[in-house]
Amino acid sequence: DYLAYSHNLYFDIDTIRFFVSGFAASHFEILEGLSGTGKSSLPRYFGKFTGANVLFMPVQATWRDKSNILGYFNEFSKTYTETEFLSALYKANYEPDAINIYVLDEMNISRVEYYFADLLSVLEYPTEDWKIKLMNFPHDFVPPVKLEDGYIRIPELSYFVGTANRDDSTFTITDKV
């Protein structure tokens, strides 16, 4: 009732049950529907009520590869350009008991298979193998503490939610996803 009165939002009990039980089956959920139906609000307020860390990543139409989510190493400056997601993931490695929800808002405005492929693949493995290759270290590069041979771990309590609109401005989400 809190959301209905304070934010003009209402989720029926079955919607909330399906959302929560979906996380028991998979660490990746897609909420698909028409614009304005509360797809983004559900994970936002779920995180608020459960105390989970929630990061919203508004997907851009220009996203083409993993660098849009994970950042990239700049050979010229010898620095790693990190994203807000990578920073949050790195921080989550220091808080293994915290629940982290990463929301790809309007995920199908770009092709999911391009920018999210590495994460889709990793999430199919057992949780102890959840790590993503960020880079090969140059000879004189001093890596951050939580990177292991160029890989960053995805903590077990990490969950991914994609919101997807069903309209002419978006791509169809393939069966692979």
Spell out what each predicted region is.
Residues D1-V177:
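AAA+ P-loop NTPase catalytic core and its hallmark functional loops
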